[in-house]
A protein has these predicted regions:
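N-terminal leader/targeting and accessory segments in enzymes
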Residues: 1-80, 84, 330-334, 352, ...
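Mobile, glycine- and charge-enriched loop segments
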Residues: 20-31, 119-120, 130, 134-145, ...
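Residue-level signal for inorganic ion chemistry
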Residues: 27, 46, 81, 96, ...
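Acidic, Mg2+-coordinating active-site environments of NTP-dependent enzymes
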Residues: 56-65, 171-309, 334, 358-362, ...
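Phosphate-binding loop of NTP-binding sites
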Residues: 76-207, 211, 215-223, 394-395, ...
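ATP-dependent carboxylate/acyl-activation modules
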Residues: 96, 297-299, 413-418
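Glycine-rich phosphate/pyrophosphate-binding beta-alpha loops
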Residues: 298, 314-324
Length: 423
């Protein structure tokens, strides 16, 4: 089976799924093989559930009469099909990557652009070599543009995702100390993320630049076309303000106050507003979109629980984002406790970076410091240290945190959000 022959079948499908538990009528099921399980064994069952077609990489399960098709690699075929579909699309596609803030920025951009256009965008964090093709394949004729989030933890990954998504516009939120192990250090992070810049330059596509970020400015000096924000002489200039721990932006005499905490979210708001204005959206509509957006994804999420204010930032953590969160949280009025968990994938830099964060937390003078995870426990000798979130939960059952404000921040693998119900 090749993509051109399969494409007419795809056009009749409702959607593509790789999860056999979520098959609906007229879906196409891609049966991926794992180390311990071959989803091809579910092919006939998928057809019985109403699937329009199934793609397998195990030839013994092929049954063309039932629309069960064999390919050598389901992953390769998924990517090839998405590239073929991308070739048929004539809409602006915005590619987005960065060490921190890319998911929040993606959702803000989607909220703003949706004020005027029908916009498809990356659902959740489907931002890898499987998620990006799935997002491209979810773009329907009614969509007028798309926002594609691209994640990476090693070199050449963004390059691959760019060949699939072929963005017309691109933005890198920032360069931080994330996935140091896979990228081979901070310089490797810059090189890996900049693969988006390389693609945009070679394809003569548009780059969005935060001119307050010296790395972005240096990497895009000779790029055209470009959209800029951050400086008074940029294409778009906004000023930051805050109110009740929430960050907002001001454009001329108009203000938009978001439901996001942290000055680090200001540039995310600016990126969304800049793209909105570039695409002809009135600032009043941009204001409405930014003020209406409510984070629900454990990223800079502020929630009230009884008489306490909780800042939930448990989806991801690295030294850059952890430092920014601590500096923001210390500005909250009232007593403050931080519950911080390990920052994963730091490789040889891990012990030093955990020491640096713990030292920063102590210098900022929080009322209480609680750490979770083996890395922090190795360096935390002066305050409460737990090896796991489950261990923390057992402690919290008999020892409630008394502070008015509580920050929870950790890498996803720590599952720190499980402790919320016990705070």
């Amino acid at each position: 089976m090749n993509t051109e022959l399969f494409y007419p079948i795809f056009l009749k499908a409702k959607k593509i799924t790789i999860d056999s538990r979520k098959i609906e009528k007229n879906d196409i099921f891609f049966a991926f093989s794992g180390d311990n399980f071959d989803a091809a064994t579910l092919a006939e069952n998928a057809i019985d559930l109403g699937a329009l077609a199934v793609v397998v990489e195990n030839k013994e399960f092929e049954n063309k009469e039932k629309n069960i098709f064999y390919v050598r690699s389901t992953l390769d075929f998924l990517q090839e099909l998405s590239i073929h579909h991308r070739n048929q699309l004539d809409i602006p596609i915005i590619g987005l990557t960065g060490s921190n803030g890319k998911t929040t920025t993606k959702e803000l951009i989607h909220a703003v652009l949706s004020e005027k256009y029908n916009v498809q965008y990356t659902f959740g964090n489907l931002n890898n070599h499987i998620g990006v093709p799935l997002t491209i394949l979810s773009i329907k004729p009614e969509h007028e543009m798309a926002v594609i989030e691209m994640g990476a933890n090693h070199q050449k990954e963004i390059e691959l995702l760019c060949t699939i998504a072929r963005p017309n516009y691109g933005y890198i939120t920032n360069f931080g100390k994330a996935h140091l192990e896979g990228f081979g250090g901070f310089e490797g992070v810059i090189k890996g993320k900049s693969e988006l810049y390389d693609y945009l330059k070679n394809a003569s596509q548009t780059v969005l630049i935060n001119e307050n970020d010296p790395i972005q400015v240096e990497k895009t000096q000779d790029y055209t076309p470009k959209i800029t924000f951050g400086k008074t002489d940029s294409d778009y200039y906004f000023e930051a303000f805050s109110e009740n721990n929430f960050v907002g932006l001001q454009y001329q005499d108009q203000k938009a106050l978001s439901k996001l905490t942290g000055e680090y979210n200001f540039t995310n708001l600016c990126a969304a507003a800049s793209l909105g204005m570039h695409f002809g959206i009135d600032f009043k509509q941009i204001q409405s979109a930014l003020e209406s957006y409510t984070p629900t994804n454990m990223r800079s999420q502020v929630v009230k629980k009884d008489d306490k204010t909780l800042v939930l930032d448990t989806y991801n953590a690295n030294p850059s984002s952890m430092s920014a969160s601590l500096h923001n949280f210390v500005t909250f009025e009232g007593s403050k406790t931080i519950v911080i968990g390990d920052m994963l994938e730091l490789g040889d830099e891990s012990e030093k970076e955990h020491q640096n964060i713990l030292k920063l937390a102590q210098e900022l003078g929080f009322n209480e410091i609680v750490t979770v995870g083996k890395q922090f426990k190795n360096v935390n000798k002066n305050s409460a240290a737990f090896e796991s979130t489950d261990e923390l939960i057992q402690y919290l059952k008999d020892n409630k945190i008394q502070s008015e404000n509580i920050l929870l921040k950790a890498s996803r693998g720590i599952s720190l959000e499980k402790a919320i119900d016990f705070i």
